[in-house]
């Protein structure tokens, strides 16, 4: 009799806990549906399209604005800054100018080419001794042709 009473008590406690879990989930769903309009899922800023970024920025900046030193830029520095802005990799690539590369004083080849005279008999590393493969020559075919032909015959059983 005591075993059946224990089983009933366990079943009732599991049932009540599942019922409470169901009630909590229901309240959470109702709260989410009521507040769904206020909180919308948005992508991170770098994944948004440029037009949607403008909409988000205009919505967020409708309140009072604080203007710092960054916004007070003269015309000369603004032109320079817009030219530098094209090189920023975080900006959108819509307004980047494309064209042939500009001629520079030094080309990449001149920068990386080793123009210094080097002694080829010296090793690159001072402590390296000459190895067996340093003056390696391919074996020459013998000038005397071999008259013997070698045949390998299978074992006969």
Swiss-Prot record:
Protein's cellular compartments: Cell membrane
Quaternary assembly: Interacts with GRB2.
Family statement drawn from the similarity comment of this UniProt entry: Belongs to the GAPT family.
UniProt keyword annotations, A-Z: B-cell activation, Cell membrane, Membrane, Transmembrane, Transmembrane helix
PANTHER family assigned to the protein according to its UniProt record, in alphabetical order: PROTEIN GAPT
Substitution effect: residue 141 to A: Abolishes interaction with GRB2
Gene Ontology biological process terms, A to Z: B cell homeostasis; B cell proliferation involved in immune response
Region (Disordered): 78-108
Keyword Cell membrane attributed: yes
Recorded topology in the membrane: Single-pass membrane protein
Function of the protein: Negatively regulates B-cell proliferation following stimulation through the B-cell receptor. May play an important role in maintenance of marginal zone (MZ) B-cells.
Tissues where this protein is expressed: Highly expressed in spleen and PBL, detected at lower levels in thymus, and undetectable in all other tissues tested. Also expressed in various B-cell lines, monocytic cell line THP-1 and NK-like cell line YT, but not in T-cell line Jurkat or HeLa cells.
GO cellular component terms, semicolon-separated: Golgi apparatus; intracellular membrane-bounded organelle; plasma membrane
Pfam families attached to this UniProt entry: GAPT
Protein name as catalogued: Protein GAPT
Species this chain originates from: Homo sapiens
Matching InterPro entries: Protein_GAPT
Main location: membrane
Transmembrane domains' residue ranges: 11-31
Keyword Calcium attributed: no
């Amino acid at each position: 009799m005591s075993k059946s009473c224990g089983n009933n008590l366990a079943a009732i406690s599991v049932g009540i806990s599942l019922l409470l879990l169901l009630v909590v989930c229901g309240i959470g769903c109702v709260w989410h549906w009521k507040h769904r309009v206020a909180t919308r899922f948005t992508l991170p800023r770098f994944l948004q399209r440029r037009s949607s970024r403008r909409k988000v920025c205009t919505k967020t900046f409708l309140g009072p604005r604080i203007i710092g030193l960054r916004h007070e830029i003269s015309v000369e520095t603004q032109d320079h800054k817009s030219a530098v802005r094209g090189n920023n990799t975080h900006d959108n690539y819509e307004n980047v100018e494309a064209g042939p590369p500009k001629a520079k004083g030094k080309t990449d080849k001149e920068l990386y080419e080793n123009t210094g005279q080097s002694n080829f008999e010296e090793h690159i590393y001072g402590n390296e001794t000459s190895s067996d493969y340093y003056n390696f020559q391919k074996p020459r075919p013998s000038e005397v042709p071999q008259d013997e032909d070698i045949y390998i015959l299978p074992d006969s059983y």
